[in-house]
Amino acid sequence: MQLSRRDFIKGLVAVGSASVFLAGYSETVDRLVKPRYTEVKPDSVGRIVHSACLGCNVRCGIRVNVVQRGGMEVVERISGNPYHVYNRYVSKEKQSRRYEPLPYNTPITEGLKYSGTLCARGEDGIHYLYDPYRIIVPLKRAGPRGSGKFKPITWEQLINEVVNGGVIEETGERLPGLKELFAYGILSEAGFDANAVLSEMKKDVDAIMEIAKDDTKSYGELTEAINNFKAKWSAKLGEKGLKLEDILIDPDRPDLGTKANQLVYMRGRGQGHADYFYQRWTYAFGSVNWLRHTSSCQLGYYAGNKIWSGYHDVQADPIGAKLLLMVGAQMGRLHPGATGQGLIVERAAEGELKVYYVNPTAPRTTANGNIVWVPIRPGTDAAFAMALLRVMFERGYYDAEFLSYANTDAARKAGYPLNTNASWLVIWEGDRKGEFLKGEDIGLGSDNPVVYAGSFVTNDSVEKAEIFFDGYVETKEGKRRVKSALQILKEECFSRSVEEWCEICGVDVAVIYEIAEEIRKAMPNCGTIVHRGAGMHTNGEYNVWALRCIDMLIGNIHRKGGLMTRASHTNYNKELYYVDKSKFGEPVRWGPPIDRHKVAYEDSLEYWMKKKRGENPYPAKRPWYPLTPEESYTEMFAGIAEEYPYPIKALIMYYANPVLSANFGVKFIEVLKDTSKLPLFIAITTSINETFLYADYIVPDTMYLETGTMGINYLYATSASVTLAEYWRSPAVMPMTQLVGTCPNGHPKYASMWEFLIDIALKLKMPGYGKGAVKGVGAYDGQKFDLYCAWEYIMYVFANAAMDAKKRGLIPETVSDEEVDFVEKNYPIARFKDIVPNEWRYVAYGLARGGVFTRYEDSFDERGYSKRKPWTDTVYFWSEKLAKARNSVTGEKFYGGPKYLPPATYAPLGTERRFYGTPLREIYPESQYPFLVVPPGSPLFTKHRSMFYYWLKQVMPENFAVINPEDAEKLGIESGDVIKIVTPTGELEVVAAVEPTVVKGTIAIPVGMGRWADSAVKKPAYFRLNDGSVAALVSELPDGASLPSDAVNPVKQLDETKKRILFTKSDRRYYDDLGIDSWRFSGVTPNVVACVDTSLDNWPLLSWIGAAQVYFFIPAKVEKTGKRKKFEMPNVWW
């Protein structure tokens, strides 16, 4: 009998400690799982499409096999795309060391002989397409919000009511239309040149803000300027029958912007051209509120990186590294995911790579002893970094030459791609503490930073300077103490002994010294891979920055094995057809976003009005986040609830489920249920989840094997470390949602996000849509092209990319008929080649390979530096921007460098004033809550959008709480016991799995389950909440499904045999009649009882700087329930 890899792994996981098993049986394991490969030939009766997966957000390539079944095309199989840099090709000759994709120029007929690796999630994408709970027609609420009652409406009614307003007939509620908020349209209909008016109005607002920030101007002068503004524009608008309040949110606060800002577009999972498309739409509406779910994704990691590097996504090159420190980065989950990270495991198993896996949970493989688990206490990652940095400083394990270069030109002249600010001097006392000493401060007539190089000089006047300096300098303000940026870091590291740092983080002292020695041997070809486990804490940005100081010290940046950002991509938005997200004639917009990201409180009129009245401007009503690179779920909902900084009238939410995916996101139900705070809520989705249950309108969307998220996308850092990489996603099958019309150019339109936004834009007459709405650029300069449907937009994108790739020499000048014929016979999108006839042959070449990719071996110069352009000039050990930024509640300045700070609230609960709040362990001491719950990701499931993965659910039908054996023994807990986890916000019951794969004092509950709404509703019984208001809303949930049968379930169209194959373990009521199958709503999520910030009205806990959701710090105690549950250890797969 040949043991399959899947069967073997299932058996392997049954062993309590996989690492112990592997240690003794590695040779046997190697023989058992060594696969046999045969050439895979194309199906003679089917189609093959190379596209991109969206089982998670890693963006691997896929090969989709489509065949005829019962007269209908169906997806039969999904495997890996061998051309894609993540999947890596497989052949009989490459059964190990599978590190490379197929060469990009491999003819498609040859490429079809090979396959690429792919994880289980990618293979089970079939069940996302064929999901009985999918919505296929537009729906309208037919009862109170949250009742679960919806009725089908026509596409035309949907568009008309969203634009002009509608009525919930069953309750009598009036729903506003977007037309009421479309300031550009209101001005245009009145006969104004809308953008001329808005542009002049914004200039006037800017002038008001200049007066506000001028210390010589009084409160009276400021109010006079505002009154003059109101008088001017009331008169101008009145000439054509308009009032100022028809255009502005609040004429007394003109800095808040136009009424268009009262529309929020919030997306959950985003992909390249879906993102560009609806960002373009939001800007065409004139709103600043295009928001993303990043606070629930990796925003702490992003914000931390942005501070020190100027770019948000930076990781170590896993292909060229000799050593990796994976800190808070989960094996098999983080980019490049289970598929791409197979390369890390394989390199480690082959002895080419050493990995230290610093995480509260184990990696579940030792790779022949080369992946070493370093258990750590949640939230103490900066303490670990400080211990390691201290040893590196003590032993001189750093690149002093690299660190000494004071400016970028000098560093590049010496062969480095950039410099650090290690030598820049920081003022260390007085009101300007934390700011850089500038040339003008000491009479040098320059605003450049000052360094010490035998004397005090500006950094641009010398090549090298002292990296360790602590002394005094005479300034215009008197004698001041100054320190170099690296001196400050060194002193922070030496503020505690290695033993004291280890006492905080729980890491063995000997391990710190061991890692330091391994760094010495591997530098500079080593680096850190950091992610959610370190970043998604209140102190997350400081954690990330402290860890990245390891990389800066050894000078590994922008080189093989070291830190790199994302690969570049083609000019896919503006090579020939200008489809970029801005500068297409959109309305002028201004004002702070509702979540206040990238905007300082000190730049608001609210702040300056208070200050000029002589009031303390602090606290602000909610925090502002000037240094975060992206947006926040929690602060969006808090802003809506508190109407701060202004009320919101309409929310369009796409591909999202914040109620379940955010920590304590159940609080958001209060906002979603309240029609006075949120008058219009539109959901664009494939099914009705826990958030969309409260929507007024449901727009059916397509998924990624259809037109959903089609287009081109970059890959996350390091993008396999190549110079250019992008996937091209095109449909494998045509959409199963309703055909809603034909565009004027004869192309079919299917119900989806794409066509909904286009049709709304056409009805509102938004700029950038319709006849001649897309301008030609480059070779097409002066020409205009139509935008009436999704196919036109996407074909312009593919044409742009293909022609740029041709210009770069990646797509050949002459494309063979064989390549074009393959695409025209296999790809549904080929039927729209008429849109880009001149570029079609080159588009076909890229489509045939699922994207454009370069090769790793061509991506570095002879010295090992990346051929990519460096993303920045300088990286930072100290940030003046952060040191000058203030906590919006206390008004205190943030600390401007890497530092260990305990996880804490945003503001102190008492009278103390500082830039961070009360430590959480003071509020929730270990004596009351001895455990911390963490929610690691699962290699099988993706947060809370994986319930349709039928095959995966058979492997892992529910999740569990993993508890360390020593903790379990003290509590008398065994695997299979149902335990009660009690947190400050509530309690949940979950089955226990006793394993040594989690650090003592920590409980791990893999996320991805615990659902209660997905078109059908199954009232949750596994948790109880302490918040009476939220608990009452949960108790009001309906139980069951009340959707019309013709509104859902595209599976009914399939051949009976195909249905039985797809759903082998389910009653036909599940796939024919929307019956509730128990596996769909099994398991738990710890998010419902996660921590809140008691200093901010009990909203979900966030990071201080980036507003990231805090997932990995849930204080808890454990109680036995006396109940047991049948529990199969082979199903412990996380």
Curated annotation (Swiss-Prot):
Enzyme Commission (EC) number: 1.8.-.-
Major enzyme class: oxidoreductase
Signal peptide: 1-31
Residue span(s) of domain 4Fe-4S Mo/W bis-MGD-type: 46-133
CDD domains linked to this entry: MopB_CT_Tetrathionate_Arsenate-R, MopB_Tetrathionate-Ra
Cited Pfam families: Molybdopterin, Molydop_binding
Record's subunit section: Probably composed of three subunits: TtrA, TtrB and TtrC. Precursor interacts with TtrD.
Domain notes: Residues 7-17 are sufficient for TtrD recognition.
Record's protein name: Tetrathionate reductase subunit A
Annotated organism of origin: Archaeoglobus fulgidus (strain ATCC 49558 / DSM 4304 / JCM 9628 / NBRC 100126 / VC-16)
